[in-house]
Amino acid sequence: MAFDKDAIIASLKEASISDLNDLVKAIEEEFDVSAAAPVAVAGAAGGDAAAKDSFTVELTEPGSAKVKVIKAVKDITGLGLKDAKDLVDGAPSAIKEDVKEDEANDIKEKLEAAGATVTLK
């Protein structure tokens, strides 16, 4: 089967957003990959006012139910299974950075429910 890159690009240009969304989901399922953007490692530079409004959720210790914690990290971050596992295995590690207080507390509750120890910074 010949691979015609230009024909594929032309087809994608003509497709609707809904069709493209379905295509991305099908590719993710077929190849067991995730199209989600990776989590930022470095926080944005900001003043004291920005620091009070944003938090970093840090996984301190995964605990004994590591599989549940990996699944929770995968769901929270949108990472693939391997990336989520690497993040949990590398604890202490930042799960999400620059999030509002409500979202940070929600993430903390989910991870603690899975058995992890979490700190907000």
UniProtKB/Swiss-Prot annotation:
GO terms for biological process: translation. InterPro entries: Ribosomal_bL12 (IPR000206), Ribosomal_bL12_C (IPR013823), Ribosomal_bL12_C/ClpS-like (IPR014719), Ribosomal_bL12_oligo (IPR008932), Ribosomal_bL12_oligo_N_sf (IPR036235). One of its GO terms (cellular component) is cytosolic large ribosomal subunit. Keywords: Ribonucleoprotein, Ribosomal protein. Coiled coil: none annotated. Pfam families: Ribosomal_L12, Ribosomal_L12_N. Transmembrane segments: none annotated. Disulfide bonds: none annotated. One of its GO terms (molecular function) is structural constituent of ribosome. Forms part of the ribosomal stalk which helps the ribosome interact with GTP-bound translation factors. Is thus essential for accurate translation. Belongs to the bacterial ribosomal protein bL12 family. Homodimer. Part of the ribosomal stalk of the 50S ribosomal subunit. Forms a multimeric L10(L12)X complex, where L10 forms an elongated spine to which 2 to 4 L12 dimers bind in a sequential fashion. Binds GTP-bound translation factors. This is Large ribosomal subunit protein bL12. It comes from Limosilactobacillus reuteri (strain DSM 20016).
